[in-house]
């Protein structure tokens, strides 16, 4: 199984820091932010990893990561020429992934607990998608998963709703079969003109082809100054950046 890290975007919410570097290279704990999703994939046994990023800072990311020998993995790099949404960036992984199932992590997502058990469950899943949820105090900032009465199935995902139907949010770790690329080709751009990953996930929801897990450990994205500080506190509190099981 292969892994994809999406590390594009211009990081407007972290300006002016992102005027000089890609946000995924900012320090979180004792390492650059992108090291955490890399370690997550490796902890799940995934060592063939594609990194998708924008053209402005591609050179910095390649210089930092190299071919992957420092991590005992293999890196491939692709450029997203312009911001077109998470699903647009994901579409660039089609040739890399081929006909296999794969795992996607957003490069600003920081977790303290290994995703290995969830990836192992996905390996046994015959088809479809698997997404990870976390219960949070302010779900309206994220994509919110509405669950059925028995909490067995996701019935809808709403992006940043004013009145969330639950406090379970979809974190930036997604597992897909190769059908996802056909789905991306057929989704309609959002009002901001981007291909949204929520539209992709809702296709799987509507077709009863998605399972979910509620993650253990702590999680945050690091895309704002507040959440970047939270991510640093989170990793320094465990006194290391090694993903644990």
Residue ranges and their predicted role:
Residues 2-5, 13, 27, 31-106, ...:
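Conserved N-terminal catalytic core of the sugar/cofactor nucleotidyltransferase
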Residues 19-24:
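Short alpha-helical oligomerization interface
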Residues 25, 145-147, 212:
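A structural signal for short hydrophobic beta-strand segments in well-ordered beta-sheet cores
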Residues 67-72, 147-148, 203-205:
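Short, conserved catalytic or adaptor-binding loops enriched in Gly and charged residues
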Residues 113-141:
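Conserved donor-nucleotide/metal-binding helix-loop-beta segment in metal-dependent transferases, i.e.
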Residues 119, 123, 153-245:
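Catalytic-core segments of class I nucleotidyltransferases/pyrophosphorylases
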Residues 131-133, 144-146, 173-175, 219:
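Conserved hydrophobic/aromatic beta-strand scaffold that supports enzyme active sites
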Residues 137, 145-153:
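Ligand/cofactor pocket segment of small-molecule handling proteins
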């Amino acid at each position: 199984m292969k892994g994809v890290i999406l590390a594009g975007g211009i990081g407007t919410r972290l300006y002016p820091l992102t005027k000089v570097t890609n946000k995924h290279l900012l320090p979180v704990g004792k390492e650059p932010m992108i090291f955490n999703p890399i370690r997550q994939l490796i902890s799940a046994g995934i060592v063939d990893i594609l990194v998708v990023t924008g053209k402005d800072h591609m050179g910095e990311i390649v210089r930092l990561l190299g071919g992957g020998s420092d991590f005992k993995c293999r890196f491939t790099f692709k450029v997203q020429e312009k911001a077109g949404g998470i699903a647009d960036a994901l579409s660039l992984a089609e040739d890399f992934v081929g006909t296999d199932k794969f795992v996607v992590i957003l490069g600003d997502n920081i977790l303290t607990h290994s995703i290995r058990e969830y990836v192992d469950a996905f390996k046994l899943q015959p088809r479809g998608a698997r997404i990870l949820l976390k219960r949070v105090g302010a779900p309206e900032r994220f994509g919110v998963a509405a669950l059925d009465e028995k909490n067995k199935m996701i019935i809808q995902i709403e992006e940043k709703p004013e009145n969330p139907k639950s406090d379970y949010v979809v974190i930036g770790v997604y597992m897909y079969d190769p059908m996802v690329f056909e789905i991306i080709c057929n989704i309609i751009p959002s009002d901001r003109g981007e291909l949204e990953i929520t539209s992709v996930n809702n296709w799987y929801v509507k077709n009863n082809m998605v399972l979910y897990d509620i993650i253990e450990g702590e999680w945050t994205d690091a895309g704002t100054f507040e959440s970047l500080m939270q991510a640093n506190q989170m990793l320094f509190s465990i006194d290391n950046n090694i993903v644990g099981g």
